[in-house]
Amino acid sequence: MAEITAQLVKQLRDKTGAGMMDCKKALQETGGEMEKAIDWLRQKGLASAGKKAGRLTAEGLVDSYIHTGGRIGVLVEVNCETDFVARNEAFRSLVQDIAKQIAACPNVEYVSIDEIPPATVEREKAIAMGSDALKGKPENVKEKIVQGKMDKTLRELCLLDQPFIRDQSITVEELIKQAIAQLGENVKVRRFVRFVMGEGIEKEEANLAEEVAAQIAAKEAPPAVVEAPVAETPEPAVAETPEAKPAATESKPAKSKSAKKKK
Protein backbone atom coordinates (compact mmCIF):
# COMPACT_ATOMS: atom_id res chain seq x y z
CA MET A 1 0.00 0.00 0.00
CA ALA A 2 1.40 3.36 -1.03
CA GLU A 3 1.93 5.98 1.65
CA ILE A 4 -0.88 8.49 1.57
CA THR A 5 0.88 11.82 1.77
CA ALA A 6 -0.53 15.34 1.70
CA GLN A 7 1.01 15.77 -1.75
CA LEU A 8 -0.82 12.70 -3.06
CA VAL A 9 -4.11 13.97 -1.65
CA LYS A 10 -3.54 17.36 -3.29
CA GLN A 11 -2.87 15.73 -6.66
CA LEU A 12 -6.13 13.81 -6.46
CA ARG A 13 -7.98 16.96 -5.47
CA ASP A 14 -6.55 18.87 -8.44
CA LYS A 15 -7.66 16.12 -10.81
CA THR A 16 -11.16 15.62 -9.45
CA GLY A 17 -12.18 18.80 -7.63
CA ALA A 18 -13.32 16.69 -4.68
CA GLY A 19 -12.82 17.79 -1.09
CA MET A 20 -9.56 17.08 0.73
CA MET A 21 -11.15 14.64 3.17
CA ASP A 22 -12.94 12.85 0.33
CA CYS A 23 -9.67 12.53 -1.58
CA LYS A 24 -7.89 11.17 1.47
CA LYS A 25 -10.65 8.63 2.07
CA ALA A 26 -10.60 7.60 -1.60
CA LEU A 27 -6.86 6.94 -1.44
CA GLN A 28 -7.25 4.97 1.78
CA GLU A 29 -10.01 2.85 0.26
CA THR A 30 -7.99 2.10 -2.87
CA GLY A 31 -4.57 1.51 -1.35
CA GLY A 32 -3.18 4.83 -2.54
CA GLU A 33 -3.65 4.11 -6.26
CA MET A 34 -4.52 7.33 -8.07
CA GLU A 35 -6.65 5.94 -10.92
CA LYS A 36 -8.66 3.69 -8.63
CA ALA A 37 -9.15 6.60 -6.25
CA ILE A 38 -10.52 8.71 -9.13
CA ASP A 39 -12.94 5.92 -10.06
CA TRP A 40 -13.98 5.58 -6.41
CA LEU A 41 -14.77 9.30 -6.23
CA ARG A 42 -16.73 9.15 -9.47
CA GLN A 43 -18.76 6.19 -8.22
CA LYS A 44 -19.60 8.15 -5.07
CA GLY A 45 -20.51 11.20 -7.13
CA LEU A 46 -17.82 13.27 -5.44
CA ALA A 47 -15.45 13.89 -8.33
CA SER A 48 -16.88 17.23 -9.40
CA ALA A 49 -18.67 18.39 -6.25
CA GLY A 50 -15.68 20.28 -4.90
CA LYS A 51 -15.41 22.49 -7.98
CA LYS A 52 -18.98 23.73 -7.48
CA ALA A 53 -18.79 24.25 -3.72
CA GLY A 54 -17.97 27.96 -3.93
CA ARG A 55 -20.65 28.94 -6.41
CA LEU A 56 -23.55 31.20 -5.42
CA THR A 57 -26.81 29.53 -4.41
CA ALA A 58 -29.66 32.03 -4.63
CA GLU A 59 -32.50 29.72 -5.65
CA GLY A 60 -33.90 26.69 -3.91
CA LEU A 61 -36.83 25.39 -1.92
CA VAL A 62 -38.39 25.67 1.52
CA ASP A 63 -40.04 22.37 2.36
CA SER A 64 -41.74 20.81 5.35
CA TYR A 65 -42.19 17.37 6.85
CA ILE A 66 -44.70 16.34 9.51
CA HIS A 67 -43.95 13.02 11.15
CA THR A 68 -46.73 10.45 11.59
CA GLY A 69 -48.97 11.44 14.49
CA GLY A 70 -48.21 15.13 14.15
CA ARG A 71 -45.81 15.24 17.11
CA ILE A 72 -42.72 16.33 15.15
CA GLY A 73 -42.53 18.89 12.35
CA VAL A 74 -39.63 20.26 10.29
CA LEU A 75 -39.09 23.30 8.08
CA VAL A 76 -35.91 23.36 5.98
CA GLU A 77 -34.44 25.66 3.35
CA VAL A 78 -32.10 24.13 0.76
CA ASN A 79 -30.50 26.37 -1.87
CA CYS A 80 -29.28 25.72 -5.40
CA GLU A 81 -28.05 27.93 -8.25
CA THR A 82 -31.00 28.07 -10.66
CA ASP A 83 -34.77 27.95 -10.61
CA PHE A 84 -34.58 25.14 -13.16
CA VAL A 85 -32.88 22.83 -10.66
CA ALA A 86 -35.15 24.05 -7.85
CA ARG A 87 -38.11 22.65 -9.82
CA ASN A 88 -36.29 19.41 -10.60
CA GLU A 89 -37.86 16.31 -9.05
CA ALA A 90 -34.46 14.97 -7.95
CA PHE A 91 -33.76 18.21 -6.06
CA ARG A 92 -37.20 18.19 -4.44
CA SER A 93 -36.69 14.58 -3.38
CA LEU A 94 -33.33 15.53 -1.85
CA VAL A 95 -34.92 18.35 0.17
CA GLN A 96 -37.63 16.01 1.45
CA ASP A 97 -35.00 13.44 2.48
CA ILE A 98 -33.11 16.13 4.37
CA ALA A 99 -36.31 17.21 6.16
CA LYS A 100 -36.96 13.61 7.23
CA GLN A 101 -33.35 13.33 8.38
CA ILE A 102 -33.79 16.36 10.64
CA ALA A 103 -36.99 14.90 12.09
CA ALA A 104 -35.10 11.70 12.95
CA CYS A 105 -32.22 13.52 14.70
CA PRO A 106 -33.35 15.09 17.99
CA ASN A 107 -29.85 16.27 18.93
CA VAL A 108 -29.11 18.15 15.71
CA GLU A 109 -29.06 21.94 16.15
CA TYR A 110 -26.72 23.23 13.43
CA VAL A 111 -26.10 22.63 9.73
CA SER A 112 -22.31 22.30 10.04
CA ILE A 113 -19.65 22.42 12.73
CA ASP A 114 -18.64 25.91 11.56
CA GLU A 115 -21.97 27.28 12.84
CA ILE A 116 -21.48 26.17 16.44
CA PRO A 117 -20.99 29.24 18.68
CA PRO A 118 -17.58 29.52 20.43
CA ALA A 119 -19.34 29.58 23.81
CA THR A 120 -20.83 26.15 23.11
CA VAL A 121 -17.43 24.80 22.08
CA GLU A 122 -15.84 26.12 25.28
CA ARG A 123 -18.62 24.67 27.42
CA GLU A 124 -18.19 21.23 25.85
CA LYS A 125 -14.43 21.47 26.36
CA ALA A 126 -14.88 22.33 30.04
CA ILE A 127 -17.21 19.35 30.48
CA ALA A 128 -14.72 17.03 28.80
CA MET A 129 -11.81 18.39 30.86
CA GLY A 130 -13.71 17.79 34.09
CA SER A 131 -14.19 14.08 33.43
CA ASP A 132 -13.04 11.74 36.22
CA ALA A 133 -11.49 9.48 33.57
CA LEU A 134 -8.74 12.06 33.00
CA LYS A 135 -7.45 12.04 36.57
CA GLY A 136 -3.82 11.02 36.81
CA LYS A 137 -3.21 11.04 33.04
CA PRO A 138 -0.38 13.04 31.40
CA GLU A 139 -1.34 16.40 29.88
CA ASN A 140 -0.62 15.33 26.29
CA VAL A 141 -2.88 12.29 26.73
CA LYS A 142 -5.58 14.46 28.28
CA GLU A 143 -5.51 16.81 25.29
CA LYS A 144 -6.01 13.95 22.84
CA ILE A 145 -8.85 12.43 24.85
CA VAL A 146 -10.58 15.79 25.27
CA GLN A 147 -10.23 16.62 21.58
CA GLY A 148 -11.67 13.24 20.62
CA LYS A 149 -14.65 13.67 22.95
CA MET A 150 -15.28 17.20 21.73
CA ASP A 151 -15.18 16.19 18.07
CA LYS A 152 -17.70 13.42 18.72
CA THR A 153 -20.02 15.65 20.77
CA LEU A 154 -19.92 18.57 18.35
CA ARG A 155 -20.50 16.38 15.30
CA GLU A 156 -23.61 14.95 16.95
CA LEU A 157 -25.01 18.49 16.88
CA CYS A 158 -24.41 18.96 13.14
CA LEU A 159 -26.73 17.84 10.36
CA LEU A 160 -24.05 17.30 7.71
CA ASP A 161 -22.15 14.85 9.92
CA GLN A 162 -25.11 12.53 10.57
CA PRO A 163 -25.32 9.12 8.88
CA PHE A 164 -28.01 9.28 6.22
CA ILE A 165 -31.14 7.51 7.51
CA ARG A 166 -31.72 5.66 4.23
CA ASP A 167 -28.08 4.64 3.74
CA GLN A 168 -25.96 4.53 6.89
CA SER A 169 -22.77 4.09 4.86
CA ILE A 170 -22.77 7.77 3.88
CA THR A 171 -23.28 11.03 5.73
CA VAL A 172 -25.73 13.79 4.84
CA GLU A 173 -22.77 15.81 3.55
CA GLU A 174 -21.83 12.99 1.18
CA LEU A 175 -25.46 12.70 0.09
CA ILE A 176 -25.45 16.38 -0.86
CA LYS A 177 -22.17 16.00 -2.75
CA GLN A 178 -23.70 13.18 -4.75
CA ALA A 179 -26.64 15.46 -5.55
CA ILE A 180 -24.24 18.21 -6.66
CA ALA A 181 -22.57 15.81 -9.08
CA GLN A 182 -25.94 14.61 -10.37
CA LEU A 183 -27.59 18.03 -10.73
CA GLY A 184 -24.53 19.89 -11.95
CA GLU A 185 -25.05 22.73 -9.47
CA ASN A 186 -23.94 23.68 -6.00
CA VAL A 187 -26.44 22.70 -3.28
CA LYS A 188 -26.44 23.96 0.30
CA VAL A 189 -28.62 23.49 3.36
CA ARG A 190 -29.09 27.03 4.59
CA ARG A 191 -31.22 26.63 7.71
CA PHE A 192 -33.82 24.50 9.41
CA VAL A 193 -36.08 24.38 12.44
CA ARG A 194 -37.43 21.32 14.21
CA PHE A 195 -40.67 21.48 16.20
CA VAL A 196 -41.68 18.99 18.89
CA MET A 197 -45.26 19.07 20.16
CA GLY A 198 -45.36 20.32 23.76
CA GLU A 199 -41.66 21.21 23.83
CA GLY A 200 -40.94 23.84 26.48
CA ILE A 201 -44.21 23.29 28.32
CA GLU A 202 -43.68 22.00 31.84
CA LYS A 203 -46.16 19.35 32.90
CA GLU A 204 -46.93 18.74 36.56
CA GLU A 205 -46.25 15.07 37.12
CA ALA A 206 -48.19 13.55 39.99
CA ASN A 207 -46.18 11.58 42.54
CA LEU A 208 -47.84 8.15 42.62
CA ALA A 209 -46.74 7.38 46.19
CA GLU A 210 -48.07 10.67 47.48
CA GLU A 211 -51.31 10.24 45.56
CA VAL A 212 -51.91 6.74 47.04
CA ALA A 213 -51.07 7.93 50.56
CA ALA A 214 -53.54 10.78 50.21
CA GLN A 215 -56.28 8.41 49.06
CA ILE A 216 -55.65 6.02 52.00
CA ALA A 217 -55.66 8.88 54.49
CA ALA A 218 -58.95 10.12 53.09
CA LYS A 219 -60.53 6.66 53.54
CA GLU A 220 -59.25 6.14 57.11
CA ALA A 221 -60.18 9.56 58.38
CA PRO A 222 -63.24 9.53 60.77
CA PRO A 223 -66.35 11.07 59.33
CA ALA A 224 -66.72 14.67 60.22
CA VAL A 225 -69.46 15.48 62.81
CA VAL A 226 -71.85 17.99 61.44
CA GLU A 227 -73.57 20.03 64.16
CA ALA A 228 -77.24 20.72 63.59
CA PRO A 229 -77.99 24.40 63.61
CA VAL A 230 -79.69 25.61 66.84
CA ALA A 231 -83.09 27.11 66.20
CA GLU A 232 -83.31 30.61 67.54
CA THR A 233 -86.19 31.25 70.03
CA PRO A 234 -88.25 34.08 68.71
CA GLU A 235 -88.67 36.99 71.07
CA PRO A 236 -92.23 37.43 72.40
CA ALA A 237 -94.16 40.05 70.59
CA VAL A 238 -94.88 43.15 72.61
CA ALA A 239 -98.62 44.01 72.59
CA GLU A 240 -99.28 47.56 71.79
CA THR A 241 -101.19 49.47 74.57
CA PRO A 242 -104.24 51.16 73.10
CA GLU A 243 -104.43 54.84 73.69
CA ALA A 244 -106.81 55.84 76.53
CA LYS A 245 -109.99 57.40 75.32
CA PRO A 246 -111.72 60.13 77.32
CA ALA A 247 -114.63 58.85 79.46
CA ALA A 248 -118.03 59.56 78.07
CA THR A 249 -120.04 62.15 80.12
CA GLU A 250 -123.38 60.80 81.19
CA SER A 251 -126.17 63.29 80.56
CA LYS A 252 -129.03 63.51 83.01
CA PRO A 253 -132.41 63.27 81.46
CA ALA A 254 -134.18 66.59 81.40
CA LYS A 255 -137.23 66.97 83.65
CA SER A 256 -140.43 67.46 81.88
CA LYS A 257 -142.62 70.57 82.49
CA SER A 258 -145.45 68.45 83.80
CA ALA A 259 -143.38 67.18 86.68
CA LYS A 260 -142.54 70.71 87.82
CA LYS A 261 -146.25 71.61 88.03
CA LYS A 262 -147.14 68.78 90.41
CA LYS A 263 -144.77 70.14 92.99
Curated annotation (Swiss-Prot):
Region (Disordered): 221-263
Domain of life per record: Bacteria
CC annotations in GO: cytoplasm
Involved in Mg(2+) ion dislocation from EF-Tu: region residues: 82-85
Bias (Low complexity): 221-251
UniProt keyword annotations, A-Z: Cytoplasm, Elongation factor, Protein biosynthesis
CDD domains: UBA_EF-Ts
Signal sequence coordinates: none
Main function: Associates with the EF-Tu.GDP complex and induces the exchange of GDP to GTP. It remains bound to the aminoacyl-tRNA.EF-Tu.GTP complex up to the GTP hydrolysis stage on the ribosome.
Protein name: Elongation factor Ts
